[in-house]
Amino acid sequence: MAMKSVSTLAVFAILFLVIVEMPEIKAQGSKCLKEYGGNVGFSYCAPRIFPSFCYRNCRKNKGAKGGRCRSGGAGAGSMICLCDYCSDKP
């Protein structure tokens, strides 16, 4: 009986240490996506141009694998270019 208690205690101790030592899972986007340079405007991210100027300039000027555009919030043509250092997906 004492051996079973010690074994159970050892298993729980090991499980606790494994859980405590696991690295935190952080949002991948924070490491991968960096802003190119403020409000770049709609023409920089125009959907008819492929790949976009955002994608091309992130690769050429920032050494990123690609670039993505996001809406910059309220306002007509408010767009933000995010350089992607993890994926080349436009």
From Swiss-Prot:
Which domain of life does the UniProt lineage start with?
Eukaryota
Q: Which residues form a coiled coil?
A: none
Record keywords, A-Z: Antimicrobial, Disulfide bond, Fungicide, Plant defense, Secreted, Signal
Chief subcellular site? secreted
**What Pfam families does the annotation carry?**
Toxin_3
Subcellular location per the Swiss-Prot or TrEMBL entry: Secreted
Query: Which processes are annotated in GO (biological process)?
Result: defense response; defense response to fungus; killing of cells of another organism
**Its GO CC terms?**
extracellular region
InterPro entries under this entry?
A: Scorpion_toxin-like (IPR003614), Scorpion_toxin-like_sf (IPR036574), Scorpion_toxinL/defensin (IPR002061)
GO MF assignments: serine-type endopeptidase inhibitor activity; sodium channel inhibitor activity
Q: Where is the signal peptide?
A: 1-27
Which cysteines link up through disulfide bonds?
C32-C86, C45-C69, C54-C81, C58-C83
Instruction: Give the positions of the site Reactive bond.
Output: R48, I49
Q: Hey, which family's this protein in?
A: Belongs to the DEFL family. Protease inhibitor I18 (RTI/MTI-2) subfamily.
Q: Supply the name of the protein.
A: Defensin-like protein 193
What organism is the protein native to? Arabidopsis thaliana (Mouse-ear cress)
Gene coding for it? ATTI2
